[in-house]
Amino acid sequence: MCIRDSYEGVSVFAGVGERIREGHELWHEMRKSGMLDKTLMVFGQMDESPGVRFRFGLSALTYAEYLRDSLQREVLFVVDNIFRFIQAGSEVSSLLGRMPALVGYQPTLTTEVAEIEERIISTDRGAITSVQAVYVPADDMTDPAVAAVLGHLDTTVVLSRGQAGKGIYPAVDPLASASKMMDRHVLGDRHYAVAQGVREHLARYRELEDVIAMLGLAELSPRDREIVMRARKLQRYLTQPFHVTSAQTSIDGASVPLEHTLSDCEAFLRGDHDATSEDACYMRGAMDTATETSA
């Protein structure tokens, strides 16, 4: 894979409260992909005591800091799952007899989250970039634990049950996801305009879904029908066959350069692919291959 071959940094994986079976499977997958020589894996397994699980996240971060500061390496710090780190802290708090705070969480919730998040920084010696899985209880984004974590993140990618139910994989909800980098001065005028245009189409389609379910497409205005048609194709275009899932899906992985993605989205917004079938946009990668199989 191109990322594996070109990546010159090191990765630290922190499995906080990870199931033993899942950790074992991940280790074998990493060995099979040839990434173990660039990866450090730290597990605080779910059968460990709350104190051990709570400290393991901080221990893994200490390894990442050593690689950054002493070896001057670029570090990718992956945490699965940061919510289990918070849960372990809550269990420790209960054992210490502390009075619970909001929704039963520990009174030191924000302090404990900040203790790990604020150490993930770049220095003149190297950088730590972190990717963290955040479990959302009952899909409630306002949960105190979730809110405490999200406040420290630059970008949030929300995986939606609704998207998965439609067969959209990865099941990313573009409207619920957000990034501090989504700024015209950071992205440039073209990238920002394309992103906003895609979001506007998807947002309008979501507003009209209930109307379509009750009355059908025929009751929409010509402009709304056009937006819905293009939004549905954009939704399918944003699916991506992953290299790591090719063994399960029998679909070869595809990587699409940013320039191709922007050009394809511009073409959708202009209506260049209005004659292309929705199926031709699904799991295809770049549209230059999709149009060849359009209906």
PLM features: residue spans?
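Short, small-residue-biased leader/transition segments that mark boundaries at the very start
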Residues: M1-I3
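Conserved catalytic/coupling modules of large nucleotide/cofactor-utilizing molecular machines
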Residues: T62, Y66, R84-F85, E91-A295
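Fold-independent oxyanion-binding glycine-rich loops
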Residues: G15-V16, G44-M46, N81, A133-V134
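Loop/turn-to-beta-strand initiation segments
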Residues: E8-S11, D37-L40, L71-L76, R125-V131
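Phosphate-binding/switch loop-helix module in NTP-utilizing enzymes
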Residues: R53-G89
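Residue-level signal for short amphipathic helical patches enriched in basic/charged
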Residues: E18, S33, S70, T123, ...
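Residue-level marker for buried hydrophobic side chains located in beta-strands
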Residues: A14, F77-V78, M283
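Nucleotide-state-sensitive switch-loop elements of NTP-binding domains
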Residues: Y7-S11, E18-Y66, V92-E112
